[in-house]
Amino acid sequence: MLTSPLRQDHLVPETLMADASPIIRPETPPDLHIPDSQATVKVSIIDTTSYMSNFPMWAFLDPLMPGHEEMKGCDFSFIIEHPKSGNKYDTLLFDLGVRKDWENLPTPFVQGIKAGGCKIEVQKDVATILKDNGRDLSEVGGIIWSHWHFDHVGDAQTFPGTTDVIVGPGFKKAHVPAWPTDPESHIDEKAWQGRTLREIDFAAEEGKGLKIGQFDALDFYGDGSFYVLNTPGHTIGHLSALARTTVDPPTFIFMGGDIAHQGGEFRPTPYMPLPAEISPNPFNRILPRPALTCPGEIFVEIHRNKSRTEPFFDPTTAEGAWHHCAHEAKRSIDKLTEFDAYENIFPVIAHDNSLYGVIDVYPKPANDWFAKSWKDKTRWGWLNEFDPSFAGLAKASEP
């Protein structure tokens, strides 16, 4: 594989920072064994206009951090276009965000959301966003659901019956039939009525046995331009995807869905240690007088293990959490870190608020993300979700 490991050349083990904290050289990540290819897909990141707030963070992450008790924010999905696949899937969607009329979701879900005081706002559904930009919805051959949760399945009924719904392994056994046939289900079975519900079986599909990194993979178009990845844990059959965005240099976008809910679940790592100086300053949007850079040491001080090489969070194992299996989710996240270690692979998880103001969204393409340094500009942006008044974080502001 032509991808090269992320190098942080300012991290040299023989030197010390001014506060005498050791500086750590990144470890070399394992080869991901991505086959060479001259084929790419066009990718755009869709701002689904969904905004969720007042969801309890304890139901997603552990440990809780000061100022980080609420899960809130955006919801990204993707449109993938293959120039000449020769099949109905020339245009794909990966996730749909939240349906605009979310109160028409299954009754048990809506009742639970309202009882919990959670808030959901949606300006437009993805179908409307596409039509507003001149797209013919009949061109969309399939919708890949990363998983079945409300903020990813959208409303498939806004697409014609020729658009398939594509799900991960185990979905049908776990979730079919759904609401209203199963009155306790949180999934509306009308999503796949009158259309094909395709469940990917990584063991049986053509090219079985393929692995990209440690993930079971499906070469979706058969030309190395787009891989669907098996990333279970958050739910049964959770899917991610890897899209080749350029050939020279080879670059990729990792479409994460909810493989993680916050950057601190997969950063820092031995492959990507917390740097001595973080640039740009993650607090530059919320502090009145932010310094240009931010000392990494202030975040080490609030890390659960005072570590520069371990993620800040794990998927929570608390009763009532939103994960099907937190331990399996953690294993998928650990596999993700090997992808994130490469400078030319850009993981985009659905709820990464730090991407706003940096990335281009649909209808603009995302294929030039590497040339525009989106990963460099957003790698540590999630740190701004911590309360800057907590402990030593005030050092992020100018004196």
From Swiss-Prot:
SMART domains hit by this protein: Lactamase_B
One Pfam family, short name: Lactamase_B
EC number(s) reported in the record: 3.1.1.-
Keyword Ribonucleoprotein: no
GO molecular function annotations of the record: hydrolase activity; metal ion binding
Amino acids binding Zn(2+) 1: 147, 149, 234, 258
Inducing stimuli: Expression is induced in response to 2-benzoxasolinone (BOA) exposure.
Chain sites annotated for binding Zn(2+) 2: 151-152, 258, 351
Record's keyword annotation contains Oxidoreductase: no
Pathway: Xenobiotic degradation
Gene Ontology annotations of biological process type: secondary metabolite biosynthetic process
Alphabetically ordered keywords of this record: Hydrolase, Metal-binding, Zinc
Effect of loss of the gene: Impairs the ability to of metabolize 2-benzoxazolinone (BOA) and thus growth BOA-amended media.
Signal peptide: none
Note, other: Fusarium verticillioides possesses 2 unlinked loci, FDB1 and FDB2, necessary for detoxification of antimicrobial compounds produced by maize, including 2-benzoxazolinone (BOA). The FDB2 cluster arose as a duplication of the FDB1 cluster with rearrangement and expansion by incorporating additional genes.
Function: Gamma-lactamase; part of the Fusarium detoxification of benzoxazolinone cluster 1 (FDB1) involved in the degradation of benzoxazolinones produced by the host plant. Maize, wheat, and rye produce the 2 benzoxazinone phytoanticipins 2,4-dihy-droxy-7-methoxy-1,4-benzoxazin-3-one (DIMBOA) and 2,4-dihydroxy-1,4-benzoxazin-3-one (DIBOA) that, due to their inherent instability once released, spontaneously degrade to the more stable corresponding benzoxazolinones, 6-methoxy-2-benzoxazolinone (MBOA) and 2-benzoxazolinone (BOA), respectively.
Protein family per UniProt: Belongs to the metallo-beta-lactamase superfamily.
Protein name, UniProt field: Gamma-lactamase MBL1
Lineage of the species this protein comes from: Eukaryota, Fungi, Dikarya, Ascomycota, Pezizomycotina
